[in-house]
Structure formats: C-alpha cells, structure tokens
Curated annotation (Swiss-Prot):
Species name: Tolumonas auensis (strain DSM 9187 / NBRC 110442 / TA 4)
Family: Belongs to the ribosome modulation factor family.
Name of this chain's protein: Ribosome modulation factor
Pfam families for the chain: RMF
Disulfide bonding pattern of the chain: none
Biological role: During stationary phase, converts 70S ribosomes to an inactive dimeric form (100S ribosomes).
Taxon lineage: Bacteria, Pseudomonadati, Pseudomonadota, Gammaproteobacteria, Aeromonadales
InterPro entries in alphabetical order: Ribosome_modulation_factor (IPR007040), RMF_sf (IPR023200)
C-alpha cells in the first residue's frame, strides 16, 4: 500500500511540473487531497523556478 501511495504522489508531482512548464496557474491544481495537492504544487514550483531561471528551452 505504501508503494502505491508514493506512486500516486509522484504522479501528482510530475503532473504539477508539467503544468508549471506549460505556464498554467497554480489555481488549476486538480487535486483536493492535501498530500497530493502539496506534491502537485511542489512540482509546479520547481518548474516555475526553472522557467524563470531560463533552464527550459522550448
């Protein structure tokens, strides 16, 4: 069960990262669960930071 939960949270982080790279607002987070929402926002923050520092090249 713990592995499944971790995988779900990692997927939330990945989806948040992708949303951040695409320039979407953090208000569009699809998760209601606090844990998943936190992971999604963490991924989103990482992507936004990388975009602002110029790491991502389209």
């Amino acid at each position: 069960m713990k592995r499944q939960k971790r995988d779900r949270l990692e997927r939330a982080r990945t989806k948040g990262y992708q949303a951040g790279l695409a320039g979407r607002s953090k208000e569009l987070c699809p998760y209601q669960c606090i844990d998943a929402r936190g992971y999604w926002l963490g991924g989103w923050r990482d992507a936004v930071d990388e975009r602002s520092q110029g790491y991502m090249v389209n």
